[in-house]
Amino acid sequence: ARIRAISAGQQSELEARAGEEGWDVTRTELEVLRAARPTAPAVHGSSPVPTVRVLEAAAWMSAGIDEPDCLSEFGERTLEAAHPLRQIGLRELVAECARIEGHSVPRVFGDGQATIRAGFSTISLPGILESVMNRTMLAAYQASPIAALQLCAVGSVSDFKEVSRYRLLGTGGFEKVSPTGELKSGALSEQKYSNRADTYGQILMLDRRDIINDDLDAFLDITRQMGRSGAESIDDLFFTLFLSNPGSFFSAGNSNYLEGADTAFGTDSLTSAKTLFRKQKAGPGTKAKDQKPINVRPRFLVVPVEVETDAELLMGSAQLMIDASGTKTKIPVDNPHRNKYEVVSMPHLSDSYYAGSSAKAWYLFADPAVLPAFEIVFLNGRRAPVIERIEAPPNTLGMGFRGYIDVGVKEQDPRGAVRVKGEA
């Protein structure tokens, strides 16, 4: 009764709990006093300063990098923390980096001088920008088709010195082992192929105008173009060398060249080119074993864009019909070339920018993993370009980055490709 009197008029919940839990008078009085205390107002502090990792994730999201890539790189927890900043611009990114490292920056951007100077003096800002730039450049590079990587062997070099590749003669083939178990020695020819990597790249500056304009995507468009340029530079190197016909690479002497009025692209000329390709010898020596066939098949049919449709029709047609006069028609009886070769068509082959270009010449290439006609090498096997920060000139209020790729292209085994002139 006394407990009921103490809690009466206040909280029926307390009375019920007191009965259920067997509170004494003292406990009941204490709980009533606690319940009667006024509730303190909630205190709302300022939002916590994001970490460098959260800012980096926010910058990735703002740059439009695919969500699965972001999740793989940062994890779900970091992405959740970065979500409120997913549309962060350059101004806010610069300011937040400065605050993280203890710099006092104005809340109002104004002319940006104080914020920009503080941000550019940090360690975190260039690191975040370098990360975002490398990712956007890599995505652009990987989205760009590179014909050279289909047609060439790909190797790795550890420095910029010239490296050598040797060709195994026909005398190096397997021979029957005598009853004594003695294996005969093969021989490497004196003929060797070389290659080396060089550096290709450009400089990119982030200056105060980019920060004031507050357009991260516009800045990253330049980075994306650097990625595309990296891909284009590989094809440019390859086609410049390839079309120049270095050292008479494609020639009758190498048994990999056809010309004449009957070599215009078509069924019969493709048959002739395939036959020439299939009859390549182990050579180049004069011994009987050097004249053994190597039995390598062409895999790629390489044509200029002017011939691309005809090549695709020939590869895709189940039948070929010839009229009474022997003239080929557009109507596709059995096609021996159907789906035999993978068509690779590039505008470089007929563009007058490249010496040796032709709108009529076409080629057959072996699988480069079997018999490479050309080789591409990358320094330490890194195929994609890379972006690094560099020191900006002292008279420049900005931040410098360099994008570059270390790559080399060189002709290798002439037996790995055939050129057909396509005309007399």
Sequence positions of predicted segments:
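Intrinsically disordered, low-complexity terminal tails
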Residues: A1-I123, A417-A424
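Short, solvent-exposed loop/turn segments at the edges of secondary structure
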Residues: A197-G201, V296, T396
